[in-house]
């Protein structure tokens, strides 16, 4: 099972990244758990300095921007 963490305060960009992750997981029938991390104190512990942040299976893949859907799909499928 993939473990996907979307890190951020819940701002519009964080919500968009979470929605994109859900789309990619659903469209590719992936077994994944998507977790939102909104506790600012955890950001640094997770290696996130800018939000939104994306962590897949413990690896920071993006921070401070929203990847394109195709890039996100590539990252998630490659991490599976």
Which ranges hold each PLM region?
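Generic recognition of short, well-ordered alpha-helical segments
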Residues: 16-19, 49, 67
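Non-catalytic, surface beta->alpha helical segment in thiol-disulfide oxidoreductase systems
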Residues: 59-80
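Structural micro-motif
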Residues: 47-55
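Residue-level recognition of oxygen-bearing side chains
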Residues: 16, 42, 71
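Conserved helix-turn-beta segment immediately C-terminal to the redox Cys motif
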Residues: 20-34
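Local sequence-structure signature of Cys/Sec-based thiol-disulfide redox active-site neighborhoods
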Residues: 1-20
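Amphipathic, hydrophobic secondary-structure cores in small proteins
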Residues: 34-47
């Amino acid at each position: 099972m993939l473990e996907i963490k979307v890190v951020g305060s819940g701002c519009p960009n964080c919500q968009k990244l979470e929605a994109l992750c859900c789309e990619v997981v659903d469209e590719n029938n992936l077994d994944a758990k998507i977790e939102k991390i909104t506790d600012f104190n955890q950001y640094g512990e997770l290696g996130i300095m800018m939000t939104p942040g994306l962590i897949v299976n413990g690896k920071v893949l993006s921070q401070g921007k929203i990847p394109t859907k195709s890039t996100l799909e590539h990252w998630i499928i490659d991490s599976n």
